[in-house]
Amino acid sequence: MGLTISKLFASLLGRREMRILMVGLDAAGKTTILYKLKLGEIVTTIPTIGFNVETVEYKNISFTVWDVGGQDKIRPLWRYYFQNTQGIIFVVDSNDRDRINEAREELQSMLNEDELKDAVLLVLANKQDLPNAMNAAEITEKMGLHSIRNRPWFIQATCATTGDGLYEGLEWLSNQVGK
């Protein structure tokens, strides 16, 4: 009952909600991004074995962001978070040239899942502050993003530690809500 009333007020006040699944390979910066958005500061992180979930407010949208660990042994568990996901944030370590193909394979596998067929995709090309980082155009090519035809997608260059690009990514997601 309480949830129904809060949703009614949210709709009357123009407040919207979006369920986001944030995934990517281990050490890509997912947890750092989540807490930079939530708290506005850098937090010391350890590898995420399960998940972190936080609500991030941006403009009139309440994003519920599920940050799920990216270690290879726990990636099969990602599927348990797919239900009701409206947006996917796939975080890529722009400096990790050795694993960009692995990142592409994981993303393509996810995008083939029926439960995610209606989810929009935001790729965050993270760690742009590092000197050897691939730019967004190079990551777009290496991740095969131009071949995605069945959903809206966007790539944003980011630096989780400074916050550069994070709100531009949220801006794109916020424009997708209700489309």
Curated annotation (Swiss-Prot):
- What GO CC annotations are associated with the protein? cytoplasm; Golgi apparatus; plasma membrane
The residues the record assigns to binding GTP are: 24-31, 67-71, 126-129
Q: Which GO terms are recorded in the biological process aspect for this UniProt protein?
A: cellular response to reactive oxygen species; intracellular protein transport; vesicle-mediated transport
The UniProt GO MF terms for this protein read: GTP binding; GTPase activity
Keyword Nucleotide-binding among UniProt keywords: yes
Q: Give the lipid-moiety residues, type N-myristoyl glycine.
A: 2
Q: Could you tell me where this protein is found in the cell? A: Golgi apparatus
Report the leader peptide range. none
Task: List the SMART domains.
Answer: ARF, RAB, SAR
Q: Which NCBIfam families does the record cross-reference, listed alphabetically?
A: small_GTP
Query: Which protein family is named in the record?
Result: Belongs to the small GTPase superfamily. Arf family.
Function of the protein: GTP-binding protein involved in protein trafficking; may modulate vesicle budding and uncoating within the Golgi apparatus.
Identify this protein by name: ADP-ribosylation factor
Query: What organism is this sequence from?
Result: Candida albicans (strain SC5314 / ATCC MYA-2876)
The upper taxonomy is: Eukaryota, Fungi, Dikarya, Ascomycota, Saccharomycotina
